Each structure stands twice: as structure tokens, then as C-alpha cells.
Amino acid sequence: MSGNESVVNYDHFIDKRRVRKAFERAAPLYDQAAVLQREVCDRMLSRLEYIKYMPDVVLDAGSGTGYGTCKLLERYPDASMLAIDIATGMHHQARQRMNSMIPRWRQLFGVGRNQRTSRVRYVAGDIEQLPLEDSCAGLVWSNLALQWCNDLKKTFDEMRRILKNGGLFMFSTFGPDTLKELRQAFRHADDYSHVNRFADMHDIGDMLVHSGFATPVMDMEYITLTYDEVISVMRDLKAIGAHNATGARHRGLTGKNAWQKAIGHYETLRTGGKLPATFEVVYGHAWKPAPRTSILTPETRRHIGLE
């Protein structure tokens, strides 16, 4: 796929209503299973150490339960924060997290409550269609949320729209090898899609350029989690709301025979008594360039026929 194309494969089309419901259900216990999300967030934060830039407004796009939001507030103590998520239940958990960071005696007497919480505005919405005005943020931060977008090019256009000139877009998402073991296991079981599809790092970089971003920097790494049983992999995915929401998914329950075939194939991958679950994590950042200004005077432009 070329970077300037915007094509949606409806077999891989993500049902946003299903995604929202999954995250609403997952919100209360999300943090118990979101080990990978926190780890990737911390690795993104370490990358920020090398970028000397102080935004006045930060957008956490796909803010979840607020782990990254709190970290960004600490890093940018003078910035205000916009936290957008598709599930309002995630915002409820984020507010609880924020309040838990205030000492109990301060909560009882109302001292210091507004010093942190008043800097955060929670917004319910889809990051593919941001309900925000143009040029409102200096930094757009998105940790493991872009994989839920149907049209990445459109999403990048939105990120550029709401960024201020000279602003930074920093993100992580999943690459094609994510959950490759699970995908291969079910490929031996039936013809349905059981794992969402993920964009290639190089395609993502191309789309950033075609969306008007400057100097994109991309890299990736593999992170492998290990489990005792296949069912534990599925439970963790369910606990973080990571259901398969594509159009090609099975609309009913996976049959017993298909399930047993999938388990049997997955078991052949057991190493050292553990089953692997691989995640290809793609990192990227790019800048919204300032508009180009002509060095030609109006008189010169008229003289050479440009006006």
C-alpha cells in the first residue's frame, strides 16, 4: 500500500461499537492485566528524554486508565492535558488514579486537589475523528491506541490538524507480527479471523509523510510475554479489552473442535515449559512543520508572474 492511499479492507474493518463496549467492560480491572501497556509507555517516556521540547498543551490520544496521563503531567508540570478515550469507563478509572495520587489528608481538606486534576480535561471520543479544534495541542501522545483505527492516514491527518505548528506527534502501536503464535494456531483451526491486522512500520512512516509530517523517526522491537496455558493468553487479551473486532471474525463461539486444534498447534510452541505471546511494538515520532514562507517580496513575485 502506498502512503497516500486510504483503503479500508472490510474483512479487517474494526467495529468501533464493539471496541467501545469491550473497553467499557474491561475498564474496572484493566490495570491488573495491562502490564505490556505500562511497559511500552515507560519506554516511550524514556525516548522523550532525548527530545528537548516543552509543550503547553498535551493530548493523550487513547488515554485509557490514565497511567500515561499522570506520567506526562509529572514530566510537563506547566502543561495542561487533554485525555481522550473512546470509553467513558476508562475516564472514570483515570480520575480515580489521579485522586489516589493526592495524599488522604489533602483530599479531606480539599488542599492540592486542583493543582493536578484541574490541569486535565477528559474528552470522550474517537481518535479517528477528534472532537477538538485546530492547532490546540503542542504534543500528541498515543500509546498503543492506533491499532484500533480503521484508517491510519485519516487519523494522522487529524493529529496534524490539532497540532500546533512545530508540534510533536509521538506514538506506539502494534506491528504485523503481534500475536503471531495465536494467529498461526487458529489458522490451523478454521478460516475465520481471530486476531486484528496491524500495519507495517514502513507503511506507517510513509503515511506520516503523506499526511504532512516532517522528519518521521520509526523503530520497532519485539516483546514476548510467556504464559502457562493458551487460555491465559485469551483471558489477558479479554481483560484489556483486546477482542478481535474485525469484520471477518466468527460471529458465534469458536467450536470445540476448532478450539482444540488451535490449542494443539499453540502447544507445539511451548519452550521451557512456557507458551510465548509475541508483540511487535512500533514506535514513531514526527513533527508538524511550520508553514513555508516565501523570501520573495510581493513586488518581486508580481514581476516574475507569481501574482
From Swiss-Prot:
Superkingdom of source: Bacteria
GO biological process annotation, one example: biotin biosynthetic process
Single Gene Ontology MF annotation: carboxyl-O-methyltransferase activity
Biological pathway: Cofactor biosynthesis; biotin biosynthesis
E.C. code: 2.1.1.197
Reaction equation(s) it catalyzes: malonyl-[ACP] + S-adenosyl-L-methionine = malonyl-[ACP] methyl ester + S-adenosyl-L-homocysteine
Keywords linked to the UniProt accession: Biotin biosynthesis, Methyltransferase, S-adenosyl-L-methionine, Transferase
Top EC class for this record: transferase
Task performed by this protein: Converts the free carboxyl group of a malonyl-thioester to its methyl ester by transfer of a methyl group from S-adenosyl-L-methionine (SAM). It allows to synthesize pimeloyl-ACP via the fatty acid synthetic pathway.
Protein family membership: Belongs to the methyltransferase superfamily.
Protein name as it appears in the record: Malonyl-[acyl-carrier protein] O-methyltransferase
Organism: Nitrosospira multiformis (strain ATCC 25196 / NCIMB 11849 / C 71)
Gene name, Swiss-Prot/TrEMBL: bioC
